[in-house]
Curated annotation (Swiss-Prot):
Cystine crosslinks: none
Sequence ranges of Basic and acidic residues compositional bias: 130-144
Protein name per its UniProtKB record: Cytochrome c-type biogenesis protein CcmE
GO MF annotation list: heme binding; metal ion binding
SUPFAM superfamilies: Heme chaperone CcmE (SSF82093)
Membrane disposition: Single-pass type II membrane protein
Summary of the function given for this chain in its UniProt record: Heme chaperone required for the biogenesis of c-type cytochromes. Transiently binds heme delivered by CcmC and transfers the heme to apo-cytochromes in a process facilitated by CcmF and CcmH.
Stretch list, region Disordered: 130-174
TM region(s), chain numbering: 8-28
Domain of life from the UniProt record: Bacteria
Compartments, record wording: Cell inner membrane
Gene that produces this protein: ccmE
Classification via InterPro entries: CcmE (IPR004329), CcmE-like_sf (IPR036127), NA-bd_OB-fold (IPR012340)
GO biological process: cytochrome complex assembly
Length: 174
């Protein structure tokens, strides 16, 4: 065997080992990747029951039903809606019309059994996919900084009952 053929065999074996390692890494990652979906994508695509997903959109007004520690609500992007069932404490910012991301498992009846619910801290923030879906459906409303203004953000919050600070009178010294 010549030096050239040994070098080619060594390079080929090295590339084969690298390809095998890359394939194993991608296979392992495929089991842990959770895809982000909008309600329209969940309704249109054939997603197998039992698949993990992140569902993002707005909490549909009038859809929140609490029963003890459990809550059911609908997430919408303006075109479609998906019901989410969650057991646990909801974030403080969770409310109707507010942006939300629910991560969980798609059930055979089309609901998502969520194990975590995240509420958007700023009503103007929206994932690109959800914002695009809202724009297509005509539910996108321009806010002060170009983002959507959900119905919950339009209503004024509770007013503070604290009185304005008292102004102390100026003392005149003789």
């Amino acid at each position: 065997m010549t030096r050239k053929s040994r070098r080619l065999i060594l390079i080929g074996a090295g590339l084969g080992v690298l390809a095998l390692a890359a394939g194993l890494i991608l296979t392992a990652l495929n089991d842990t990747i959770v895809f982000f979906r909008t309600p329209t994508e969940v309704a249109q695509q054939q997603i197998a029951p039992g698949a993990r997903l992140r569902l993002g959109g707005l909490v549909e007004p009038g859809s929140v039903a609490k029963s003890g520690a459990s809550v059911r609500f609908a997430v919408t992007d303006g075109n479609s809606k998906v019901t989410v069932a969650y057991t646990g404490l909801l974030p403080d910012l969770f409310r109707e019309g507010q942006g939300v991301v629910a991560e969980g498992v798609l059930q055979s009846d089309g609901t998502v059994k969520a194990d975590s619910v995240l509420a958007k801290h700023d009503e103007r923030y929206m994932p690109r996919e959800v914002a695009d879906a809202l724009k297509k459906s005509g539910h996108w409303k321009e806010g002060e900084e170009g983002g959507p203004v959900p119905p919950a953000a339009k209503t004024p919050g509770p007013q503070s009952s604290a009185a304005p600070p008292a102004v102390s009178p100026a003392r005149s010294t003789p």
